[in-house]
Amino acid sequence: MRNYDLSPLLRQWIGFDKLASALQTAGESQSFPPYNIEKSDDNHYRITLALAGFRQEDLDIQLEGIRLVVKGTPQQPEKETTWLHQGLVSQAFSLSFTLADNMEVSGATFTNGLLHIDLTRNEPEQIAPQRIAISERPALNS
């Protein structure tokens, strides 16, 4: 029997908390760039990408249907550098996140090498639970 680890796929599904947390494991692989997804409450999320060496002009964020795509293309140095040790990676990347229904990007900021993308879940009124008042008058057919 083969075991398939779906956690690398599920960690990029934002707003599908029950599904993602049920299948996600602690030993998930990390891709470039490193990122966090935090949940403030049931309706507010934040994706934070660590982008040392990138400038704001090097970054592009697009929402394509339910896919949030973040791309980065760093500026190439004018002069070739000879590295004795290179621990900081500055390479082109493209990351995509699948958003749940009714998730919207509410804003993005780039400060101190960290790109923050804020997401909000906006439930339409017809989907949100409605409280039905109970009256004291008799029913129609009684």
Swiss-Prot record:
Compartment(s) of residence: Cytoplasm
Any GO BP: protein stabilization
Keyword Metal-binding attached: no
Primary location: cytoplasm
Domain comment quoted from the record: The N- and C-terminal flexible termini are involved in oligomerization and in the binding of non-native substrate proteins, and are essential for chaperone activity.
Protein family: Belongs to the small heat shock protein (HSP20) family.
Name this polypeptide is given: Small heat shock protein IbpB
Organism: Klebsiella pneumoniae subsp. pneumoniae (strain ATCC 700721 / MGH 78578)
